[in-house]
């Protein structure tokens, strides 16, 4: 029987959204999590659902680490864009800065798990499922050096 997420106990499992035609199983991680919108429920997937790089290598970046490993800033990450996009296959990516690069087979480690041609993560979610998601501001640390 369907229930409101807010009525479920922490660690309860729920099916919400889908990936490759299969429902995604989530665990209720917390309710009214500090720093998140009021009356919100935080979900985390029950298991790893996809292994993707955080960001593609950026060969034209002036920072040698970012040339070889991609950008470590969440705001610029390919993964952030993909996870938050309902766009069709190959349409979710937009360059976030002048050296940004798509996560295609030439710019991910050993060509493993490129995802530039995939649909956005939210693409297979229903309109009602997407409407139930809350916008959240993620605060991350940035080195002062």
Q: Locations of the language-model features?
A:
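Collagenous Gly-X-Y triple-helix signature in extracellular proteins
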Residues: 1-145
């Amino acid at each position: 029987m369907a229930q409101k997420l807010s009525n479920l106990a922490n660690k309860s499992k729920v099916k919400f959204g889908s990936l490759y035609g299969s429902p995604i199983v989530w665990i209720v991680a917390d309710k009214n999590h500090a720093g998140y919108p009021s009356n919100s429920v935080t979900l985390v997937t029950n298991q790893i659902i996809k292994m993707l790089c955080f960001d593609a290598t950026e060969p034209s970046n002036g920072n040698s680490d970012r040339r070889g490993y991609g950008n470590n800033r969440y705001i610029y990450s390919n993964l952030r864009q993909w996870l938050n996009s309902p766009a069709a296959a190959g349409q979710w990516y937009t360059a976030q800065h002048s050296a940004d690069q798509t996560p295609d087979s030439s710019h991910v480690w050993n060509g493993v798990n490129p995802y530039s041609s995939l649909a956005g993560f939210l693409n297979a979610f229903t309109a009602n499922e997407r409407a139930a998601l809350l916008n959240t501001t993620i605060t991350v640390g940035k080195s002062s050096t």
